[in-house]
Amino acid sequence: MVLASLQSELTSLRVCARLHCVMTAAEKALSTFREPPHMFNCAQTVCAAFGRDDLLEAMKVCGGGRAPEGMCGALYGAIQVAPERAEELKAAFVAKNGSWKCSELKGGTPRVACQQCVAVAAQLAAGEEA
């Protein structure tokens, strides 16, 4: 009985692992955005989607409009993941969302949901269609 239960659990874990491998960058990022146990902010969640755990501590202070120059934290995280494409990422993000500044995206009546910023930034960093 215990063996059958363990085998079933192992099968479930394998299926989950396979599904995680085929998730898009946006899906990976959104799966950790403001979700327990980590409660990652926008910048952290984009970095985590690419396995960049080395950036998570530094990105703690970059959510909620606190990234340098008031940049959207999700975009800032994407730039940390792919710094060689910083200008390309910024231009594509602006084309999709209308701005790169968090205050312009969120100020007053929010124009773009944080989840959309996270999804777009992750897709762009991965080179996926945003």
Stretch-by-stretch model annotation:
Residues 5-8, 12:
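Serine residues within intrinsically disordered or low-complexity segments
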Residues 18-19:
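Short, positively charged and aromatic/hydrophobic N-terminal segments
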Residues 29-37, 61-70, 106-110:
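A short glycine/serine-rich beta->alpha loop
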Residues 35-61:
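Helix-rich "cap/lid" substructures immediately adjacent to catalytic or cofactor-binding pockets
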Residues 55-64, 90-94:
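Beta-strand segments within the central parallel beta-sheet cores of soluble alpha/beta enzyme folds
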Residues 78-84:
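DPxDG-like acidic metal-binding loop motif
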Residues 88-130:
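C-terminal binding/interaction regions
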